[in-house]
């Protein structure tokens, strides 16, 4: 009975999470955690703690997420859940990457990759390769990053992960943007946007719009950059994303710049 209650709460939390309603998702997971702690079911507890780690990670509560993931990892090692261990290692790598701890992130990712290769976990590996691509990009290894992204895209197609394909194309767009290869950056990002629209995935659409705004800004096409960034801020506001304030400030700076160049003050 307790397991069923925990499972139902986690399912409801997952539904909220998938829609970007993070506060409601956290509340469901927190209730499930109370049930699991009382019940003593280690597998159910590991699932709930993992979900709490995920929600804290996307909400910018990095240290809280790290604590949840660390407890999950201990439970998974006790239970011998190799697939779960690889996922949690990747999640810990993501937290390190978010903090700019690139060497630590890479170490977590490579440990996870070893397990995924052992398990022939192509779906997990496809995502992990994008993580390794991010580390390579941020540490100046852009050729290696592109190779990771291209290998990931092959696997994403193999396992039918369309959302993942949208992510990879957006990441390739950002990489090309960093290299000032603006045509390639825009092409990849528009492909990402097309996939996200087909999936009706507003969060991924927002991610693509953000890169497109940067592409147009790099070209000096301020009005187009503003149009895309306004869409980004709308998504940030709807889902209360962590970069709302930063993106709003960037939008205001662009509006001010356009107003100044046209001689018309912006209210």
Can you say where each PLM-predicted feature lies in the sequence?
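Long, contiguous interaction/recruitment modules in multidomain scaffold/adaptor proteins
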Residues: 1-2
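Alpha-helical linker/edge segments of TPR/alpha-solenoid repeat scaffolds
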Residues: 53, 214, 218, 251-267
């Amino acid at each position: 009975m307790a397991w069923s209650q925990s499972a139902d709460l986690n399912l409801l939390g997952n539904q909220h999470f998938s829609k970007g309603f993070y506060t409601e998702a956290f509340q469901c997971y927190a209730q499930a955690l109370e049930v699991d702690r009382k019940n003593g079911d280690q597998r159910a507890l590991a699932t709930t703690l993992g979900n709490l780690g995920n929600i804290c990670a996307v909400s910018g509560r990095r240290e809280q997420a790290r604590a949840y993931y660390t407890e999950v990892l201990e439970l998974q090692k006790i239970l011998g859940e190799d697939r779960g261990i690889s996922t949690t290692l990747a999640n810990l790598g993501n937290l390190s990457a978010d903090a700019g701890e690139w060497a630590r992130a890479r170490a977590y990712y490579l440990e996870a990759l070893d397990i995924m290769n052992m398990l022939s976990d192509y779906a997990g590996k496809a995502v992990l390769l994008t993580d390794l691509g991010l580390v390579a990009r941020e540490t100046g290894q852009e050729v290696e990053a592109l190779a990771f992204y291209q290998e990931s895209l092959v696997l994403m197609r193999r396992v039918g992960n369309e959302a993942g394909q949208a992510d990879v194309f957006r990441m390739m767009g950002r990489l090309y943007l960093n290299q000032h290869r603006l045509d390639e950056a825009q092409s990849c990002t528009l492909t990402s946007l097309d996939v996200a629209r087909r999936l009706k995935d507003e969060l991924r659409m927002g991610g693509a719009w953000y890169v497109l705004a940067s592409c147009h800004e790099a070209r000096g096409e301020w009005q187009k950059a503003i149009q895309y960034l306004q869409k980004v801020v709308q998504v940030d506001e709807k889902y209360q994303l962590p970069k709302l304030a930063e993106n709003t400030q960037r939008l205001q700076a662009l509006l001010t710049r356009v107003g100044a160049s046209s001689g018309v003050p912006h209210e």
